[in-house]
Design a protein with these regions (language model features):
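Hydrophobic alpha-helical segments
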Residues: 1-135
Length: 135
């Protein structure tokens, strides 16, 4: 059950409608999903979040499918059911195969396990793994 109301387009302020319109136009969808409807309770958060998502998810050095798969991985790591479902659906729509999804989940699981072990053991970082800015 949601902890905030979902703001429908008909009930939205002009400021929220403008963001909703941009989301619908950018994503070529008839309606915005529940995430955006929930954020509409705080128009400034809605606008800021949409602008950041729109910028980060636009085509760039990483292709759109790779970006969605990264979003799935982070969502699994953060245990966000909504984000797991929405970004998995988006990744499949962008061409992710079931085999890629299975491999992605196996990778997330392994990374979580090895990260926990390395953190718990406070393993010192090998010199060849140290990354410096600009290198």
């Amino acid at each position: 059950m949601a902890t905030v109301s979902l703001i429908e387009y008909a009930d939205a302020s002009a400021e929220v409608k403008a963001v909703f319109d941009d989301i619908k136009r950018t994503r070529n969808v008839k309606d915005v999903n529940n995430f955006w409807k929930a954020l509409a309770n705080h128009p400034a958060t809605l606008k800021r979040t949409w602008e950041a998502v729109r910028e980060v998810m636009q085509p760039g050095a990483l292709d759109p499918l790779t970006k969605e798969m990264i979003y799935v991985a982070v969502s699994v790591a953060n245990n966000c059911d909504y984000c797991i479902h929405s970004h998995t659906a988006s990744a499949f729509a962008k061409g992710m195969t079931p085999a890629q999804y299975e491999e992605l989940l196996a990778l997330v699981g392994m990374a979580s396990e090895t990260n926990a072990l390395a953190s718990a053991m406070k393993i010192p970082i090998d010199a060849q793994f140290l990354v410096e800015a600009g290198k």
